[in-house]
Amino acid sequence: MARRARRPRGRFYAFRRGRWHHLKRLRRRYKFRHRRRQRYRRRAFRKAFHNPRPGTYSVRLPNPQSTMTIRFQGVIFLTEGLILPKNSTAGGYADHMYGARVAKISVNLKEFLLASMNLTYVSKIGGPIAGELIADGSKSQAAENWPNCWLPLDNNVPSATPSAWWRWALMMMQPTDSCRFFNHPKQMTLQDMGRMFGGWHLFRHIETRFQLLATKNEGSFSPVASLLSQGEYLTRRDDVKYSSDHQNRWRKGEQPMTGGIAYATGKMRPDEQQYPAMPPDPPIITSTTAQGTQVRCMYSTQAWWSWDTYMSFATLTALGAQWSFPPGQRSVSRRSFNHHKARGAGDPKGQRWHTLVPLGTETITDSYMGAPASELDTNFFTLYVAQGTNKSQQYKFGTATYALKEPVMKSDSWAVVRVQSVWQLGNRQRPYPWDVNWANSTMYWGTQP
């Protein structure tokens, strides 16, 4: 039986399939009842191209014994990329390197904790940084200093990508941790996050709100398109932890209904939300191809899906993204912002609570905090952003591009995002005094404490 609700002015609602539906009342214009014709509906039209929540139902799972709510609030600056001194770039192509005004904001607890890290010159403020500098210490060796930091990396290695949105964010967390700076003066790893929340082993996402505003013009027409998607539309989970080599972090896509032939079994499952733009391993003609083998006419390579995959302005617009015009092209008001709201886990399976620290873990290490044991870095939603322009390269599909500049003492942001997020931690273990006393009395049976 569907739940029903009534609001003033005769508006009726019914809860079905995970959301409230507005019931259309019959017209009273005629003597006899006539049902209103179901004409074109904007919501159904948009969902035909991009459904942010494809199906939802709730599963009855036991609630935790104790919970704690944590909140994040802050601002994210979407800035243009920088390049290190051009004279040291290998190959001498620095003068011909361009970047696109695209961004990707992943909603996961790991990156929100990174966004609220300590605001010091060795952490992230102003980002990206080429490496971690020596913060304190009197000896020449970095390993003998506190905190243990390293010198900057080689200037030919990229320091960050637009997917690392937390580097350009100022986020506040409530409740605060007064010992966070002394315990974790550097960037927190998954092991540090597990120790920070060692008393909790479950977490869930309640709600996240985004308000995006375009701040920079690019020609006479330069709106910023933003689209909130469930889960990971174009990305995959990072199975290689703390790897500085980006190529080792890439994964081979396994997409359904493409007709591709995979020569190896990957770690990813097929995702129905992906557009089959490219098969994983298309058969191609090589020196060992037998005569008479039917192959495709177009030569293509393996479909690599990485964290650095973004959507163009035209793609986001075709999927029904909102537009935000910068000041000068439209008067600034509340409607100048693109409003996005994500609620729940965004999981059609209905999994509400996720594992923060696995049960039975006496010593929290990176192996315990890595997938699939811990789901701390699970993406619940992803916000894709791209700025359009009336003059762009053809293969960029209307996306604004720019020439990479050398680092200066100020950042050039083309969009600003206001964020509010609510999460909840849980613990299913029974925190009863008799259980604790029994554990203390039996823990050292047969051993010497």
Swiss-Prot record:
<dbReference type="GO" id="GO:0019062">
    <property type="term" value="P:virion attachment to host cell"/>
</dbReference>
<dbReference type="GO" id="GO:0043657">
    <property type="term" value="C:host cell"/>
</dbReference>
<dbReference type="InterPro" id="IPR007291">
    <property type="entry name" value="Capsid_protein"/>
</dbReference>
<keyword id="KW-1160">Virus entry into host cell</keyword>
<comment type="subunit">
    <text>Homomultimer (Potential). Interacts with Rep; this interaction relocates Rep into the nucleus.</text>
</comment>
<protein>
    <recommendedName>
        <fullName>Capsid protein</fullName>
    </recommendedName>
</protein>
<dbReference type="GO" id="GO:0042025">
    <property type="term" value="C:host cell nucleus"/>
</dbReference>
<keyword id="KW-1140">T=1 icosahedral capsid protein</keyword>
<keyword id="KW-1163">Viral penetration into host nucleus</keyword>
<dbReference type="GO" id="GO:0075732">
    <property type="term" value="P:viral penetration into host nucleus"/>
</dbReference>
<keyword id="KW-1048">Host nucleus</keyword>
<keyword id="KW-0426">Late protein</keyword>
<keyword id="KW-0945">Host-virus interaction</keyword>
<dbReference type="GO" id="GO:0003677">
    <property type="term" value="F:DNA binding"/>
</dbReference>
<keyword id="KW-0238">DNA-binding</keyword>
<keyword id="KW-1161">Viral attachment to host cell</keyword>
<keyword id="KW-1162">Viral penetration into host cytoplasm</keyword>
<dbReference type="Pfam" id="PF04162">
    <property type="entry name" value="Gyro_capsid"/>
</dbReference>
<dbReference type="GO" id="GO:0075509">
    <property type="term" value="P:endocytosis involved in viral entry into host cell"/>
</dbReference>
<feature type="region of interest" description="DNA-binding">
    <location>
        <begin position="1"/>
        <end position="43"/>
    </location>
</feature>
<keyword id="KW-0167">Capsid protein</keyword>
<keyword id="KW-0946">Virion</keyword>
<dbReference type="GO" id="GO:0039615">
    <property type="term" value="C:T=1 icosahedral viral capsid"/>
</dbReference>
<keyword id="KW-1164">Virus endocytosis by host</keyword>
<comment type="function">
    <text>Self-assembles to form the virion icosahedral capsid with a T=1 symmetry. This very small capsid (25 nm in diameter) allows the virus to be very stable in the environment and resistant to some disinfectants, including detergents. Essential for the initial attachment to host receptors. After attachment, the virus is endocytosed and traffics to the nucleus. The capsid protein binds and transports the viral genome and Rep across the nuclear envelope.</text>
</comment>
<feature type="region of interest" description="Nuclear localization signals">
    <location>
        <begin position="6"/>
        <end position="47"/>
    </location>
</feature>
<comment type="similarity">
    <text>Belongs to the gyrovirus capsid protein family.</text>
</comment>
